[in-house]
């Protein structure tokens, strides 16, 4: 297959290249950075002898590697799905037919559904099914999210694509990756800038509090996430935007709610995210005709 020229590439390809570099390598998530460091131990000559390789630490690094391999599969699925939705909507427009309501998703790997068995097992796929069922309308979704995206990436690379889509509903959930990649001042400034840039028909997702989970790393992250959530709710109040309170729905007991990397939700965990999102979608959106 011949490489696609830059001119003829779909917008999502150019956005991906701008975000990750022309090689298309997605930025590592915080959990991948920690796992790579841990792999120095689990792959050492002594790991098999001491049992580390097959122990809890070794199984965890293997789980992270599994989800890392899934990223490209999930990204390819949503890219193909997005293009199919665009073609179908263009056909409806050409025929002056009723346009199905459109939901556009902004975010990171959780919006991609990473951690579920397949892309449709995340909160986007689950919520889409519920939206169609509860409204009786054939909602469409275009998922612009990118695994590893920071808030500034969503602002610079995903927000500009909204003008092409003309969505009826937008959701935006990002920020977890910023904790290792941004100084606190930059982190909160970027978050505020993103939240002020989303359109008026946006539902914001706050972040889950991993209290007591994932050991000391989870506990250290709590003050940052708590402050990020305060910023999200503060800006949402200023702009009169609804917030999907993932922090209130995705809670202990954790059994079965996390995937093999002990960071991303499992399909069961994403059910909590789905409930949080659907509870926040305005009635005006659900009543669209």
Q: Where are the regions a protein language model picked out?
A:
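Short, mixed-charge, low-aromatic patches
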Residues: 70-87, 109-117, 144-151, 186-195, ...
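Alpha-helical cap/lid subdomain in secreted, periplasmic
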Residues: 156-289
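Mixed-charge, polar/low-complexity N-terminal
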Residues: 75-79, 85-86, 91-92, 96-97, ...
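N-terminal secretory targeting modules
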Residues: 1-104, 117, 133-136, 165, ...
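Short, conserved loop/turn and helix-capping segments at secondary-structure boundaries
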Residues: 21, 118-121, 222, 226
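Short hydrophobic segments within beta-strands
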Residues: 106-107, 205
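Alpha-helical interaction segments
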Residues: 67, 127, 260-264
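Conserved SGNH/GDSL esterase-like catalytic core that processes O-acyl groups on lipids
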Residues: 102-104, 110-189
């Amino acid at each position: 297959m011949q490489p696609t020229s830059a001119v003829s590439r779909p917008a999502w390809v150019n956005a991906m290249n701008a975000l990750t570099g022309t090689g298309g390598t997605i930025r590592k998530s915080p959990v991948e950075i920690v796992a790579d460091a841990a792999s120095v131990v689990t792959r050492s000559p002594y790991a098999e002898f001491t049992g580390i390789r097959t122990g809890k630490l070794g199984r965890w690094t293997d789980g992270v590697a599994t989800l890392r391999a899934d990223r490209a599969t999930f990204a390819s699925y949503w890219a193909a799905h997005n293009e199919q939705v665009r073609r179908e909507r263009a056909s409806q427009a050409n025929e002056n037919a009723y346009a199905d309501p459109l939901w556009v998703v902004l975010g990171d790997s959780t919006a991609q559904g990473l951690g579920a068995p397949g892309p449709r097992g995340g909160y986007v796929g689950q919520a889409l099914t519920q939206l169609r069922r509860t409204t009786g309308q054939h909602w469409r979704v275009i998922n612009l999210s990118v695994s590893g995206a920071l808030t500034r990436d969503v602002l610079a690379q995903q927000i500009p694509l909204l003008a092409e889509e003309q969505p009826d509903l937008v959701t935006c959930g990002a920020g977890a990756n910023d904790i290792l990649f941004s100084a606190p001042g930059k982190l909160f400034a970027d978050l505020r800038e993103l939240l002020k840039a989303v359109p008026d028909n946006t539902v914001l997702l706050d972040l889950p509090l991993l209290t007591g989970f994932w050991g000391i790393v989870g506990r250290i992250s709590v003050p940052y996430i708590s402050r990020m959530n305060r910023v999200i709710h503060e800006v949402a109040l200023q702009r009169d935007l609804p917030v999907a309170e993932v922090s209130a729905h995705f809670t202990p007991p954790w059994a079965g709610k996390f995937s093999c990397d002990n960071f991303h939700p499992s399909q069961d965990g994403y059910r909590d995210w789905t409930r949080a999102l659907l509870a926040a979608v305005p009635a005006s959106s659900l009543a669209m005709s």
